[in-house]
UniProtKB/Swiss-Prot annotation:
Reaction equation(s) it catalyzes: 2 (2R)-3-phosphoglycerate + 2 H(+) = D-ribulose 1,5-bisphosphate + CO2 + H2O; D-ribulose 1,5-bisphosphate + O2 = 2-phosphoglycolate + (2R)-3-phosphoglycerate + 2 H(+)
Transition state stabilizer, annotated site positions: 334
Active site annotation, chain numbering: 175, 294
Cofactor (UniProt): Mg(2+)
Quaternary structure note: Heterohexadecamer of 8 large chains and 8 small chains; disulfide-linked. The disulfide link is formed within the large subunit homodimers.
Name under which the protein is recorded: Ribulose bisphosphate carboxylase large chain
InterPro entries found in the cross-reference section: RuBisCO, RuBisCo_large_chain_AS, RuBisCO_lsu_C, RuBisCO_lsu_C_sf, RuBisCO_lsu_fd_N, RuBisCO_lsu_N_sf, RuBisCO_lsuI
Native organism taxonomy: Eukaryota, Viridiplantae, Streptophyta, Embryophyta, Tracheophyta
Gene Ontology CC terms, in alphabetical order: chloroplast
Post-translational modification summary for this protein: The disulfide bond which can form in the large chain dimeric partners within the hexadecamer appears to be associated with oxidative stress and protein turnover.
Amino acid sequence: MSPQTETKASVGFKAGVKDYKLTYYTPEYETKDTDILAAFRVTPQPGVPPEEAGAAVAAESSTGTWTTVWTDGLTSLDRYKGRCYGIEPVPGEENQYIAYVAYPLDLFEEGSVTNMFTSIVGNVFGFKALRALRLEDLRIPTAYVKTFQGPPHGIQVERDKLNKYGRPLLGCTIKPKLGLSAKNYGRAVYECLRGGLDFTKDDENVNSQPFMRWRDRFLFCAEAIFKSQAETGEIKGHYLNATAGTCEEMMKRAIFARELGVPIVMHDYLTGGFTANTSLAHYCRDNGLLLHIHRAMHAVIDRQKNHGIHFRVLAKALRMSGGDHIHSGTVVGKLEGEREITLGFVDLLRDDFIEKDRSRGIYFTQDWVSLPGVLPVASGGIHVWHMPALTEIFGDDSVLQFGGGTLGHPWGNAPGAVANRVALEACVQARNEGRDLATEGNEIIREATKWSPELAAACEVWKEIKFEFQAMDTLDQ
């Protein structure tokens, strides 16, 4: 027998399988300021106690495996293991629990969202002892936050670059999203920007297809930007989607955008991946480009209430990885978004310090220690009648993005942009005069139609359009 084996045997290594809760369920644990804290919604399999399920999550997302291994004796489990330090039943739900887990900071690579997610939501979501598992929230300690660059520029720097203050920014996604030639696409961009929008946008699946290669699109859109800037005297932008099949190709497109002198590029951060996104964010900061983030694929991850990852976690991860804008739902349009939940993660995107508030789904107090903020983007099924509600819900630090609500105007793209700009300016002026947008919104829009035939035509077209469906993701009662 070797000396190493003798030593291990002498301290009583005992092979076999132990209940996770014997090692990883520690209700007496006092969390540290440096711990990453997680709130999981756990649905155990029948017969599995909630404490065992919570401990299993802590174990499988940190140092544990299914059996005792002799190499446990070569390190300090007490220093490195995750700990389930609290379990509470979910009100109104049968056999669902919130399990609180604390992870020591040394488990994570600095400045890597990829590594953080690989650890916390890696294998554990396929664990057989759990019927379902959802990561509801994370508390990122300030010590870890400071290892991230975060958004390339942030809200204030973006306003300074654009010279636009005191109102939400206006955008438009060019439609049809697929099929236009580069020249016709650029024409649509020009008409929208000339009409009064601040931004236009590539749709998330516009990359470099046979009908419109990326270089051609970039060139025609740059021409549209500069022509509309010269005519209006305002700084304009188009979110040029740099997302590509490889990181190298993505960077090539971002470099070309910078050489053209445009102000902003775009990335699909979930399909593109956090590693690619962080690399692009670093390039954008170093080269003066704003970065718009689309959340394509998010609903695959966050739509189900009992399994997946809540979008507030994906939003926090984006702020760490880097992005100046991110789509965040509308509350009033065609896409998912319950009001209090949406406002909760909008605050997590914009503010420096956010208090724990379970009424808005915020499980932990989060201190971003001056990490730049991200502008939430409201888009999806919105039109001029929604403008008062959007202005009231999202406030000035937001981007309101009307695709069909601009391009669907009966008179064309430029009049559609005029209608949206007039509606926004009317709402901002009314709010600044002390009027209540929530109760007087429709009246404010009707008054503005007297001075804008474009707005009057838009109001007539969309007066009956509503998307009245119950949100899937609601607060626990």
